[in-house]
Amino acid sequence: MIDLYLSKNSQRNQLLLDFFQNYGIKVSCHSVSEMTKDKLIEMMSYSSDCFEFLSPNLLRFKNRDNLRLTDFIEMILKNPELTIRLPLAVSNKRVYPNLNLEEARALLPRDTKQLIYMEQTHYLSS
C-alpha cells in the first residue's frame, strides 16, 4: 500500500493515480493538509535527510542550532503545500518526494518491473 499526498496539480495527480491503477497497486490518497505532527515525524525517521522531501526554501534552517524540532515541525505544518515537495509517496518506510511517472516505477513490485522489461526487450527484438 502506498500513501500518496497529492499536490495542487490535478493533472499530475491523475497521471500518477492512473499509473498505479494500471498496475493494480493500492494507493491511499491524502490531502497534505491532513498531515499530522506524528506522521511528519514518522516520515522524517524514514529519511537520512528530511530536507530531501522539504522545500529548498527550508534549507536555510538545516544548520540552525537554536531552532527546536517542534518549532520547525509546526512551521512546516502551517503551510504544508509550500513546505513539502508534492506529490509525495510513502511506501515501505521510504519517502518519494516530488513524484513523477518515471520515479513512480520504483514503487512497482519487482516481478512487475521484470515483466515490463521483458515486454520492452521482446518488442525491440521483433
Residue ranges and their predicted role:
Residues 1-33:
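Local sequence-structure signature of Cys/Sec-based thiol-disulfide redox active-site neighborhoods
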